[in-house]
Amino acid sequence: MASTTTTILPKDHIKLRSTIHQKLIESGEKERLKVLLKSKLVEGGWRDEVKIACREYIKNNQNENFKIEDLIALITPIAKKKVPPQVKADLIKRIRKFLGPNIQNHHHHHIHIQSNTPNSPHH
């Protein structure tokens, strides 16, 4: 049995992400995933680590006139790196399960998941 490789062009990738996002919203799964993600991040200490990083930045820059946007720009990449790999893996697994066989054909493609969780650093 010959295997075929599907090449997803950038515009198709954007369309696929948009379709997935829409399905997650319409079904209510996005909201459930946000709640799950928040609880796992709190349990794992991620939220506390991000708060500490924010406090350190503010303490070290209290004499400078910085904007909240500056803090967010600095902390966001740090916060993303601190997300435990198991939490990411569990989230992706749950999304794949939700999407079912339709996405299994594309399992070798990396789908970047953007999330605006309620516990992001600017809250």
Swiss-Prot record:
**Keyword Cytoplasm among UniProt keywords:** no
Q: Which Pfam families match?
A: EnY2
Q: Name one GO biological process term.
A: transcription elongation by RNA polymerase II
Q: What is one GO cellular-component annotation here?
A: nuclear pore
The main location class comes to: nucleus
What are the subcellular locations of this protein?
Answer: Nucleus, Nucleoplasm
State if Transcription regulation is listed as a keyword.
Answer: yes
Which keywords belong to this entry?
Activator, Chromatin regulator, mRNA transport, Nucleus, Protein transport, Transcription, Transcription regulation, Translocation, Transport
One annotated GO molecular function is: chromatin binding
How this chain assembles, per its entry, is: Component of the nuclear pore complex (NPC)-associated TREX-2 complex (transcription and export complex 2). Component of the SAGA transcription coactivator-HAT complex. Within the SAGA complex, participates in a subcomplex of SAGA called the DUB module (deubiquitination module).
Q: What does this protein do?
A: Involved in mRNA export coupled transcription activation by association with both the TREX-2 and the SAGA complexes. The transcription regulatory histone acetylation (HAT) complex SAGA is a multiprotein complex that activates transcription by remodeling chromatin and mediating histone acetylation and deubiquitination. Within the SAGA complex, participates in a subcomplex that specifically deubiquitinates histones. The SAGA complex is recruited to specific gene promoters by activators, where it is required for transcription.
- So what family is this one in? Belongs to the ENY2 family.
Q: What is this protein called?
A: Transcription and mRNA export factor ENY2
Q: Which gene encodes it?
A: eny2
